[in-house]
């Protein structure tokens, strides 16, 4: 009986310590997000999700991390697009859309997919202007798949 009691106390202490660890990581993630270190914040929010998934005490932190993680990748995509690093922007916006869909944030998914389509429109336009119509058509097709409501993309696809 004494061993059982000691085991239960040890287990409860481990769960409590784990929840404290998740809280500390969450606070680091929030600080990084506030400092606009979106890559650092994304890594920490991923840790919060992984480590807090089985903890009832950390459920609200995990829920917030799941909401904020796609936004981190969205912001990294925005930073990459400002420097015209379209490949990096495309990677981050795509990751944002995938995570938003996974965690049920359809509004964030639509915003990220809208930017994916815009990047494909830029890349397709460059190929089209260089008279590389086959490449342009392939790129416009990817953009149209990302944002099927984009009528300009559909028109570009039809013209190429």
Over which residues does each language-model region extend?
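Canonical tetratricopeptide repeat
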Residues: 61-68, 75, 108, 115, ...
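Position-specific recognition of the canonical hydrophobic site in helix A of tetratricopeptide repeat
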Residues: 33, 81, 121, 128-129
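Short coil turns that delineate tetratricopeptide repeat
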Residues: 53, 101, 148-149
